Amino acid sequence: MRTLWIVAVCLIGVEGNLFQFARMINGKLGAFSVWNYISYGCYCGWGGQGTPKDATDRCCFVHDCCYGGVKGCNPKLAIYSYSFQRGNIVCGRNNGCLRTICECDRVAANCFHQNKNTYNKEYKFLSSSKCRQRSEQC
């Protein structure tokens, strides 16, 4: 029974919002593009601190701030509806916090696309020692 519970929790994480966000990024930038943003700069990936290194990193900072303002559900697990229409991400008929989460993810995916020319490979797997400046306010 415990094994079944662990599998269920893992599947929720895979089917949840972070997976949807990854699909949005890949849809805007191409297959497997999400891997470029998993550990980039000071804000792309788990946590975040310091000053964003470039426009790409700022996309992640804004996304973190957006998630920080979500009330009523967990932005990393909640499942919302969305679609791609003529290359544009369109959030579906979501209510309340699901709508907010979808918009956070849509804006970030579009931001990555709009700022893809600022992506700097030197910021991939950036040491946290490079992000020790005082964090900006959302």
Curated annotation (Swiss-Prot):
Subcellular location, principal: secreted
| Top-level EC class | hydrolase
Instruction: Spell out the reaction equation it catalyses.
Output: a 1,2-diacyl-sn-glycero-3-phosphocholine + H2O = a 1-acyl-sn-glycero-3-phosphocholine + a fatty acid + H(+)
InterPro entries recorded? PLipase_A2, PLipase_A2_Asp_AS, PLipase_A2_dom, PLipase_A2_dom_sf, PLipase_A2_His_AS
Residues recorded as binding Ca(2+), renumbered to this chain, are 43, 45, 47, 64
Q: In which tissues is it expressed?
A: Expressed by the venom gland.
Per the record, its GO cellular-component terms are: extracellular region
- Disulphide bonds annotated for this chain are 42-131, 44-60, 59-111, 65-138, 66-104, 73-97, 91-102
Q: Where is the active site?
A: 63, 105
Q: Where in the cell is it found?
A: Secreted
One Pfam family linked to the record: Phospholip_A2_1
Annotated signal sequence is 1-16
**Protein task:** Heterodimer RV-4/RV-7: acts as a presynaptic neurotoxin. Monomer: snake venom phospholipase A2 (PLA2) that acts as a presynaptic neurotoxin. PLA2 catalyzes the calcium-dependent hydrolysis of the 2-acyl groups in 3-sn-phosphoglycerides.
What is this protein's name?
Basic phospholipase A2 RV-4
